[in-house]
Amino acid sequence: MSSAPEKQQPPHGGGGGGGGGGGAAMDPASSGPSKAKKTNAGIRRPEKPPYSYIALIVMAIQSSPTKRLTLSEIYQFLQSRFPFFRGSYQGWKNSVRHNLSLNECFIKLPKGLGRPGKGHYWTIDPASEFMFEEGSFRRRPRGFRRKCQALKPMYSMMNGLGFNHLPDTYGFQGSAGGLSCPPNSLALEGGLGMMNGHLPGNVDGMALPSHSVPHLPSNGGHSYMGGCGGAAAGEYPHHDSSVPASPLLPTGAGGVMEPHAVYSGSAAAWPPSASAALNSGASYIKQQPLSPCNPAANPLSGSLSTHSLEQPYLHQNSHNAPAELQGIPRYHSQSPSMCDRKEFVFSFNAMASSSMHSAGGGSYYHQQVTYQDIKPCVM
């Protein structure tokens, strides 16, 4: 009876000894990783360079004589230059590939025919090189995109209408001396009333309204300055040279301008801006020409003697009327909004040229030669 328990004891003791041996064997194994962790924790990883990955890639590409590198060459440059990229951490390679592929300032060059597979060359976009001049490695200047978006509409309008050629020294303060216009005299279909906010500071006297009429009347004559009250004919002196005829000027029923009496006086008594405005006023007092067969719908026929043709700056000798006046009916078939919009642009450019070509004591004229043969485009 006692031998049975004695036989069972050795396996139990052996098992216990085995277990104890197993526990002794696990102690150094468990202590090994802990010591390794402690040793790794004591060694600090090199500090990351104080540059963005875009800046690091640009440094690598600019260091090459050919200004282009492959991905592996960029890796080699970074590892040789900065100790941070020589350690066991390999996540920076993903960041380099990410910035190369997603940033528009880097371009992947196409490979040759005999080089299949990987190994594309990377270079800097020539349009983005200015962002990295003088050590500036930011993507773009702060607020650069917002400023471009804010200034783009104004620049496009200024360049389209030629307002950038009007310096502030050419004042038009006296241009509204004899013309008093109601606020709604500029009947515009679009948003041309916004031009009042972008004109130079001295163009306030032109009496451009800050708002526009959304729809043009479909019947009847309408004009930009149809409601302007012209001054008396005797208030304006006669200019020495006659104004060149233009298809933008209103004419009589026959299509030819009638000569008027010569008024005595000197053009030197008027300031340059006022005299230039008198010449250009002929283009501004442009009423929409209607068909000659419908004189009742055209209020211009009854008001020419009181508004525009009585004024001496519209004086025209009969021998100076060119043949282009016969081309006026070509404007009749156009839509009212298209004709008025085109003629407004032409009139403003003509006024700008007249103010810049004005002489001190001579006559003042505006060049209409450029616009005489231009037909308004029908959109």
UniProtKB/Swiss-Prot annotation:
One MF annotation (Gene Ontology) recorded for this entry: DNA binding
Reported tissue expression: Expressed in lung and placenta.
Gene encoding the protein: FOXF1
Description of its domains: Activation domains C-terminal of (and distinct from) the forkhead domains are necessary for transcriptional activation.
The name this protein goes by in its record: Forkhead box protein F1
Gly residues bias: start-end ranges: 12-24
Region of interest (Disordered), ranges: 1-45
GO cellular component, one term: chromatin
Taxonomic lineage of the native organism: Eukaryota, Metazoa, Chordata, Craniata, Vertebrata
Record's function text: Probable transcription activator for a number of lung-specific genes.
Organism listed in the record: Homo sapiens (Human)
